[in-house]
Curated annotation (Swiss-Prot):
Organism: Arabidopsis thaliana (Mouse-ear cress)
UniProt keyword list: Metal-binding, Nucleus, Repeat, Transcription, Transcription regulation, Zinc, Zinc-finger
Keyword match Disulfide bond: no
UniProt function note: Probable transcription factor. Together with STOP1, plays a critical role in tolerance to major stress factors in acid soils such as proton H(+) and aluminum ion Al(3+). Required for the expression of genes in response to acidic stress (e.g. ALMT1 and MATE), and Al-activated citrate exudation.
Record-level Gene Ontology MF annotations: DNA-binding transcription factor activity; zinc ion binding
This protein's GO CC annotations: nucleus
Name the record gives this protein: Protein SENSITIVE TO PROTON RHIZOTOXICITY 2
Expression by tissue: Expressed at low levels in roots (e.g. root tips and lateral roots), leaves (e.g. at the edge of mature leaves, possibly in hydathodes, and in vascular bundles), flowers (e.g. floral filaments), stems, siliques and cotyledons.
């Protein structure tokens, strides 16, 4: 059975495009180490392993292809900047294409990360079930030895997902491939946060690819994408008079309320296992909308790709956060006598009220002057 699974993985790897030939060997080897289970293998499990293997290989092929495309565009951009006769339109188009490719790379990489994390969680659970009886017997045997040898400490050697041996107490820690930021919870604020009753709403959990997609709503006629449902309804007017009626332009939620239908409200769950906003968390708090779910996942579980050009310090994972920061970055309007600088007047006044002898510096209480050119 083990040899049969290895042959099937090799057959799946051959279906991938030739552009990832340099990576196929490592990928197929790692997939064998993760998915092939010589102890228990069922038909359903084999089908799931095939789907996961194809998903990983497809995402890897996408990453390899997009990286080569970015290399070509960057080379074109560098040549065009040195060429005086090159038009600015082609240069701006190349920059726009580079940004689009970066977003696709982030989507594929995040999808691979999420798949690996789910596989690690499932692998740990399977190991716990299989080795449960053996672990209990080992603990009983070791405790009996401790009665005759008090100086002996029971230590277990285990192998993690990457084949690295670890030593420690008997436990199966839930390890995560965390390369994102962690969030701190303020219990004083959470105590006053109201949570809707569980029977009054439905929980929807979108995939990582859907959360990182550029658009959420798509036209079923022409396929054009939109970020908001209202924009899609306005777009539908171009496809015929039947979409220009008042009923077609009203939100479906408003129609349900007006018609007396008692539909449950939809809330959303973060797909990241262990997150406070994941529905399997013991202190789960639902996200109110798709926009909230998308922004939460980007801010909490994605790398901060956008850097402020003014201060070169602040990094953001959501573009709108960068735009908000750039509005006041570098504009020092309020200064304390101690030399501390603030971008807002209320922050300065709070600082002055906390420290005795601190006063606003000369000229900081005046509103900034605006000069029109």
């Amino acid at each position: 059975m083990h040899i049969h699974m290895m042959n099937r993985d090799e057959h799946i790897a051959k279906k991938v495009e030739g552009s990832i030939s340099s990576f196929s060997g490592e990928t197929s080897t790692s997939s064998k180490q993760i998915y092939v289970n010589p102890v228990t293998t069922t038909g359903t499990k084999s089908m799931e392993d095939d789907d996961v293997s194809l998903s990983l290989l497809y995402n890897l092929s996408t990453l390899h292809e997009k990286v080569h495309q970015i290399q070509s565009l960057v080379s074109f951009y560098m040549v065009s900047t040195n060429n005086i006769n090159q038009s600015s339109g082609s240069t701006s188009l190349a920059v726009a294409n580079i940004g689009s490719l970066v977003q696709e790379i982030i989507t594929a990489a995040s999808s691979m990360l999420y798949t690996c994390q789910q596989l690690q969680i499932g692998s740990n659970n399977n190991n716990n079930d299989i080795d449960n009886d053996q672990t209990v017997d080992a603990m009983v045997l070791e405790f009996s030895r401790q009665e005759t040898d008090p100086g002996h400490d029971f230590v277990q050697e285990s192998t993690n997902l990457f084949g690295v041996q670890e030593r420690g107490q008997i436990s199966f820690p839930d390890q995560n491939l965390d390369w994102y930021n962690t969030e701190t919870i303020n219990p004083k604020k959470d105590k006053h946060r109201s949570k809707p009753s569980s029977g009054s709403y439905d929980i929807l959990e979108l995939d990582v690819a859907d959360l990182l997609a550029k658009y959420t709503h798509y036209c079923q006629i022409c396929g054009k994408g939109f970020k908001r449902d209202a924009n899609l309804r306005m777009h539908m007017r171009a496809h015929g008079d039947e979409y220009k009626t008042r009923e077609a332009l009203i939100s479906p939620t408003s129609q349900d309320k007006k018609g007396g239908y008692s539909l449950k409200k939809h809330y959303y769950s973060c797909p990241q296992h262990g997150c406070r906003w994941n529905q399997r968390h013991e202190k789960f708090q639902p996200l109110k909308s798709v926009i909230c779910a998308k922004n939460h996942y980007k801010r909490s579980h994605c790398p901060k790709m956008y850097m402020c050009r003014r201060c070169s310090v602040k990094h953001f994972s959501v573009l709108s956060d960068l735009r908000t920061h750039e509005k006041h970055c570098g504009d020092i309007k309020w200064v304390c006598s101690c030399g501390t600088k603030f971008s807002r007047k209320d922050k300065l006044m709070s600082h002055v009220s906390l420290f005795l002898g601190h006063v606003p510096a000369h000229g900081s209480s005046k509103p900034p002057t605006i000069t029109l050119k």
